[in-house]
Amino acid sequence: MLPGWELTLCLLVSLGFHFRSFYEVYKVSREHEEELDQEFELEMDTLFGGLKKDPTDFEWNFWMEWGKRRLVWLFIGHMAVSQLATLLTKKHRPWIVMVYGMWACWCVLGAPGVVMVLLHSTIAFCVAQFRSVLLSWLCSLLLLSTLRLQSVEEVKRRWYKTENEYYLLQFTLTVRCLYYTSFSLELCRQPPSAQPTPSAQGASHSYPWLLTYVFYYPVFHNGPILNFPEFFRQMQQPELNSLQHSLCIVAKGLGRLLCWWWLAELMVHLMYMHALYSSAPLLESVSCWTLGGLALAQVLFFYVKYLVLFGVPALLMRLDGLTPPPLPRCVSTMFSFTGMWRYFDVGLHNFLIRYVYIPLGGSQHGLLGTLLSTATTFAFVSYWHGSYEDLWCWAALNWLGVTVESGVRRLLETPCVRETLARHLSPQAHHRLHALLAACSTSMLILFNLVFLGGIQVGKTYWNRIFLQGWPWVTLSVLGFLYCYSHVDIAWAQTYTVL
């Protein structure tokens, strides 16, 4: 570990960089407010003393609008129904929750939405009866592909009066795909039996349990992902809470959610980062300080946004006696590609490891097997997210980042290199080398994820301005700040996280 004074200095430099760069984004937002208002129609809002709001983050506005319209009330309804079922007829709670989920789906998506979810789930269930993992995967991928067929999209659009209703159906079917895929693959792992078995394991893979899993409403529209074995086990043996403990969970959970929501709203009122990213001329002309602030603001807003979007279902799951996947870890404590994938969306990571990476061999089949397993995993993530050009580029870059990190780690762990480093470097120097490598990794991690958040053009702009036109001073300054940033992150991980 570093001396206390050095770690404190790194912490102060990191905080100073955050605040200074955020202030630069705030200044640019104010200077170009009129121009951005004309182009993107900033929203008038009384929440923060009349500050205008950047409305260009589609995902945040979409879910907030649906939340205010119906979803909040349907979530409250689920909480009431689930708690009453636990008190009155605990044995039948899964089926009651399933029926409520179907009714809630009908309330927001109508009969066509319920039929589509049932149709996809039933097809996957029927194919899984062949006990073939390959067939089940092909079925899931084909069902997922139907969501992008133009002729099918036109039919689904005619079912609804607004685009938002259509998009809600698309998002719901996309997330449900992972759920019925998990169920199907678990069913494929069960040996076919000549006679029906009354055992819990046999009953768990029945059609009613598939519907209970798929229509569990807290995670119905947007996740997070909970693999079927965990869902079944926890629904069978939930951690029942006393009334006092449940009220405490609600109070703490709502308090956190309100703080996260308030912080997210404050960010889009003070910093028009999404509008600035959508304006190529402004992005090319702002200072490097502002560019750095925009990058940090984008990734931190994405983190806070998902604290809210995953925090609501996580709260309801805890009240149901289930253990939700951990919420995303703060991106300001990430210093590696591996850590980002492991700790941001834990539910999705668990799904990918269990059903894609390990079945393909993972690290058990040598270097080539690892590369192919990792590449296939990232390819599936890109395809599931929508299969756009930006997503394929982002997935390829992240695969490259994970591969290079893994290669460097293996090199440093070879006996020759490890002994050489131990002989010539003190523990403090070893820590500094770790931070230096982490700074390089973090710079690429931020750059590659900006491709996901802003598109390929935004990524090119950052690459050109920071690493090509900005060489050497801007590039080295960024790496210097990230070096300090990495020291703090590594110390935090060693103190609070079991790696």
Swiss-Prot record:
The keyword Transmembrane helix applies. It is found in: Endoplasmic reticulum membrane; Golgi apparatus membrane. Disulfide bonds: none annotated. InterPro entries: MB_O-acyltransferase (IPR051085), MBOAT_fam (IPR004299). A lipid is attached at residues 188, 248, 330, 416 (S-palmitoyl cysteine). Residues 95-119, 209-223 dip into the membrane without crossing it. Residues 1-5, 85-94, 120-131, 184-208, 224-249, 317-369, 406-433, 488-499 are cytoplasmic. It comes from the Eukaryota. GTP binds at residues 454-461. It catalyses: N-terminal L-cysteinyl-[protein] + hexadecanoyl-CoA = N-terminal N-hexadecanoyl-L-cysteinyl-[protein] + CoA + H(+); N-terminal L-cysteinyl-[protein]-C-terminal glycyl cholesterol ester + hexadecanoyl-CoA = N-terminal N-hexadecanoyl-L-cysteinyl-[protein]-C-terminal glycyl cholesterol ester + CoA + H(+). Its EC number is 2.3.1.-. The active site is at 385. Pfam families: MBOAT. One of its GO terms (cellular component) is Golgi apparatus. Residues 23-67, 149-162, 278-287, 387-389, 455-468 are lumenal. One of its GO terms (biological process) is smoothened signaling pathway. One of its GO terms (molecular function) is GTP binding. It is a multi-pass membrane protein. Residues 91-155 are annotated as: Essential for palmitoylation of SHH. Disruption phenotype: Conditional knockout embryos are characterized by a smaller size and holoprosencephaly at 10.5 dpc, shortening of limbs at 13.5 dpc, and severe short-limb dwarfism at birth. They die soon after birth. Testicular development is significantly impaired in XY embryos by 12.5 dpc. There is a massive reduction in testis size, a reduction in the number of testis cords which are irregular in shape and diameter, and an almost complete absence of Leydig cells. Keywords: Acyltransferase, Developmental protein, Endoplasmic reticulum, Golgi apparatus, GTP-binding, Lipoprotein, Membrane, Nucleotide-binding, Palmitate, Transferase, Transmembrane, Transmembrane helix. The chain crosses the membrane at residues 6-22, 68-84, 132-148, 163-183, 250-277, 288-316, 370-386, 390-405, 434-454, 469-487. Palmitoyl acyltransferase that catalyzes N-terminal palmitoylation of SHH; which is required for SHH signaling during limb development. It also catalyzes N-terminal palmitoylation of DHH. Promotes the transfer of palmitoyl-CoA from the cytoplasmic to the luminal side of the endoplasmic reticulum membrane, where SHH palmitoylation occurs. Plays a role in proper testis cord formation and the differentiation of Leydig cells. Belongs to the membrane-bound acyltransferase family. HHAT subfamily. This is Protein-cysteine N-palmitoyltransferase HHAT. It comes from Mus musculus.
